[in-house]
Amino acid sequence: MIKNISNLGDAALYCDFGSEVNKEINSKVIRYFKSIQKENIDGINNLTPSYNKLIISFDLRKKNFQTIKKLIENLNITNDDELETNRIKIPVCCDENFSLDIKRLEEKLQITRDKIYEKFFGKEFFCYMTGFIAGMPFLGDLENELQAKRLETPRVKVPKGSVGLTEQFANVYTLSLIHI
């Protein structure tokens, strides 16, 4: 299930599940994450899951890379284990003054504002991870028709609560972001 386990500095290891971003690979990452949490392995300090990677930080005074690697390789992880999920509704306001990129999206994607909203709100998203800024969900599997490239020059300020569409993800900014 894990394609490669390698050092990440002297007190962490990097579990690589592949380069694709999809639910199947992300589910493997989460299964390992949950299993390691459940095992409560002495010496493991922190687990950081992402789309398709898992970083495991450990205390060098208690365990070394080879010991942690062997523990991870010997975990009995199956796809049969049901992953617990929660459905969360996130209210979104699309008034003109909150829709920072709607005109750009209409032009780039060659579809109307109503069609953008219809496609966006007509879908349930899968949360691949939270991060970048505190608690920011990376909601995946955005319809191809809604996928847009990142801005060439990032906004100087992104207000808290903004929803960004970037490539295959929708992100909800949990904090205001100011680029300096």
Which ranges hold each PLM region?
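Glycine-rich active-site loops that engage anionic ligands at enzyme catalytic sites
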Residues: 1-178
